[in-house]
Amino acid sequence: MSSVSGVRTPRERRSALRSLLRKRRQRELASKVASTVNGATSANNHGEPPSPADARPRLTLHDLHDIFREHPELELKYLNMMKMAITGKESICLPFNFHSHRQHTCLDISPYGNEQVSRIACTSCEDNRILPTASDAMVAFINQTSNIMKNRNFYYGFCKSSELLKLSTNQPPIFQIYYLLHAANHDIVPFMHAEDGRLHMHVIFENPDVHIPCDCITQMLTAAREDYSVTLNIVRDHVVISVLCHAVSASSVKIDVTILQRKIDEMDIPNDVSESFERYKELIQELCQSSGNNLYEEATSSYAIRSPLTASPLHVVSTNGCGPSSSSQSTPPHLHPPSQATQPHHYSHHQSQSQQHHHRPQSPPPPLFLNSIRAP
């Protein structure tokens, strides 16, 4: 009837209108995609980002949904390009090497799981919070003699050792990494020790829930370069970041060690700091020993050391997941053993035997923290 009279029925008019709207929507989407690609191409050709006046509108989620509905093959390509799960989270294994960190992801460590979280999906980061950069940390390193009290938590970790402090002035990344971590997490306890003339740092987080923003991680890696390995692990139920030096690069920055040492000697160590080192004494001893094993690339899976302050052996578990060993070995070089007169015969005999069988290179022993730190 409609073909005879030349008048369309309401159903035909609605069908034609839907067809027209569909074609118009497809043309608009195609023009958006083409303008986005052309804008990116022109920016790459000139080596500069497009100016705000030339900026093109970005595709919305609704636009992507319409495109994928019309072209399912593009949806598959888009999913193959994604390196993280759609949820924006990815579990990590410990110990975690920061050099394997994915860009633009934060770290969430808690008793419920350890994950890398995409920055856009992170609920802990604040948009208006500005963290320092590696350059800011270098400026703070240069001006540290004028900001002793501001960075006093860092100097407590030296236990007033002039040898360790002198090494730190030739290794700016140690201070830089601490400075960046402290800006993101204030409840940390750093301490230093030396192996073969190289300074290393371990940072203990006092809270079980730790969030490290992606900007902080990026700046830490910038400061560390290839000379330092930065790893995160959980040791004795505490989150620990270890910064181990592999090579000392020549630094053009010179710090007056005499002035720095004099100001640090004038500082009093608070009671709570002494108590924290007393509380972490076994953890500190374990980290010093395990870092020495990593640097010397020993294949020892587990060992036990005898603490000079306690009569019972201190079992140390290696970071590779093996259980504690029941056998005891010689006291590590950084733990001062008791005098020969107070040692039992079987302990002296065992120590002499272990020294004959183990020819480990000698290095400058770091101070024993528990003997160095005492409340005023």
UniProtKB/Swiss-Prot annotation:
Keywords: Host membrane, Host nucleus, Membrane, Metal-binding, Phosphoprotein, Zinc, Zinc-finger. Residues 22-57, 316-376 are annotated as: Disordered. Pfam families: Herpes_UL31. One of its GO terms (molecular function) is zinc ion binding. GO terms for cellular component: host cell nuclear inner membrane; membrane. InterPro entries: Herpes_UL31 (IPR021152). The modification Phosphoserine is found at residue 19. Phosphorylated at serine residues in the N-terminus. This phosphorylation regulates the localization within the inner nuclear membrane. Phosphorylation by viral kinase UL97 at Ser-19 plays an important role for correct viral nuclear egress complex (NEC) localization. The keyword Hydrolase does not apply. Residues 33-45, 317-332 have a biased composition (Polar residues). It is found in: Host nucleus inner membrane. GO terms for biological process: viral budding from nuclear membrane. The keyword Membrane applies. It comes from the Viruses. A zinc finger (CCCH-type) spans 106-211. Belongs to the herpesviridae NEC1 protein family. Forms a heterohexameric complex with NEC2. Interacts with capsid vertex specific component 2/CVC2; this interaction directs the capsid to the host inner nuclear membrane to initiate budding. Plays an essential role in virion nuclear egress, the first step of virion release from infected cell. Within the host nucleus, NEC1 interacts with the newly formed capsid through the vertexes and directs it to the inner nuclear membrane by associating with NEC2. Induces the budding of the capsid at the inner nuclear membrane as well as its envelopment into the perinuclear space. This is Nuclear egress protein 1. It comes from Human cytomegalovirus (strain AD169).
